[in-house]
């Protein structure tokens, strides 16, 4: 008999800073998941980085037992998801393990772009979406306006949305009651052959690969032999359990539950995310539909400062890819920086987070080159190639057509900041698609070049709208554009790691700005250092870092002018010889100067 009516699986989805993690804390407290001593703010954000930045990066799962007012005890498996646009992949994976989702909306700020995007993902996957108005204790909370926005912008009924304040704990028990009533119980047979979906996995130095799974059918317990469908390998289960949020072992995991499986898998790619697990004696079980592979949007080169760290760096990347399956990498070598990897990220925040995690968790020193998006080139020979690294661009004479990626951006902004946002979009070469007035907010849709969006668009959008505008974007198409490669020459030598692909209209401005920025960052040498920006063979900007020179005339008090001339000529000849053989050290900041051209 498989009675799953007491299980509820749900995710919490919301825009950044609308209080998902705080609400999760309240659930844990009310259901007694942790003692008062162990409780801390944002208990699920376990990474230091998450706490410092105040954002959720990884989705976290928790199993709690809630005694409802009808006298039954329900098992709640919930997943706290990230709200930032760079981590939408984490959200879609979490939703695949659930039957319902709580849409948390800040009652002061109202609906924002990311809530809309995540909510549509949930509805597409057939989940029951239950709106919750959070932050009701704030003086600026306006529940009626926000309910109206939820109905107008997202299109789900919000008349009886539950109002609560996760910070003060007001109304949280009501959220749990409503959740138990409105979110459906999972379906599945405990007696059927095991079928489990891997939602997430990470590497533990002692336990091997730990996989977070959602069991669809059957059950799994310690001592079972499991088969990983994609690799065909069989592993012995060491332990199964759930997070309460502590690591808690249980006797077994049954259909409808979410928990972890440890089976001493030592190979990092032994249990990929989105794979199906079954028992070794029922290998004919169907593979569950996994997750679509996500395409990175931004590429950047990562190089270890010391070449001795290359092997450690590769191991670290492998372990990180297991935990973050949207990260892609391949080996790359650069004349200026030696050996490293070209990594693909979902956006700039993702790139920063990965670099910081590598430096902290694996103790590496890294240099990052300027990020670039993927361009499509049609060559004179008729073939089409994609390029993600400016230094790998073929010669201009061989290229027939240059195409850049265009994204469709949806921006939600209060009416008073609309003018600034439109000005910013025009500056970034945007084309307006449509505009809708929804209550006090405006929803504008723009087609924007992706390389303008990924660099600093998000920060500029926030500052121009005083933090009120919100953004969601997705790749739409490739479109022809007048693009050129901007090379940076230092003392006449091209530095491959500093090359950029820019629009021809902005090239002269970008070239000047970049050389000026580099002049500030490259330390003065004993000889003049020329910094030039060039398109092909044409130099479009130049600055010089002046030489440090010793005053060789200090010892000549009076005396003949020819004596002074002789000393100056001697110094000049020495500097000239030095310049021919001298190397210039380029500091890490210079490689990232490209990012901060506009600021």
From Swiss-Prot:
Q: State its location(s).
A: Cell inner membrane
Q: Which UniProt keywords apply?
A: Cell inner membrane, Cell membrane, GTP-binding, Hydrolase, Membrane, Nucleotide-binding, Protein biosynthesis
Question: Which Gene Ontology MF annotations are present?
Answer: GTP binding; GTPase activity; guanosine tetraphosphate binding; ribosome binding; translation elongation factor activity
SUPFAM superfamilies to which the protein is assigned, alphabetical: EF-G C-terminal domain-like, P-loop containing nucleoside triphosphate hydrolases
Limits of the tr-type G domain: 5-187
Q: Which reaction does it catalyse?
A: GTP + H2O = GDP + phosphate + H(+)
Could you give a single Gene Ontology term from the biological process aspect? positive regulation of translation
Principal subcellular localisation of the protein: membrane
Recorded hits in InterPro entries, A to Z, give: EF-4, EFG_III/V, EFG_V-like, EFTu-like_2, LepA_C_sf, LepA_CTD, LepA_IV, P-loop_NTPase
What is the enzyme's main class? hydrolase
Q: What is its EC number?
A: 3.6.5.n1
Pfam families in the record, alphabetically? EFG_C, GTP_EFTU, GTP_EFTU_D2, LepA_C
Q: What does the protein in this record do?
A: Required for accurate and efficient protein synthesis under certain stress conditions. May act as a fidelity factor of the translation reaction, by catalyzing a one-codon backward translocation of tRNAs on improperly translocated ribosomes. Back-translocation proceeds from a post-translocation (POST) complex to a pre-translocation (PRE) complex, thus giving elongation factor G a second chance to translocate the tRNAs correctly. Binds to ribosomes in a GTP-dependent manner.
Which HAMAP family does this entry report, sorted A to Z?
A: LepA (MF_00071)
What is the protein name given in its UniProt record?
Elongation factor 4
Q: What is the lineage of its organism?
A: Bacteria, Pseudomonadati, Pseudomonadota, Gammaproteobacteria, Pseudomonadales
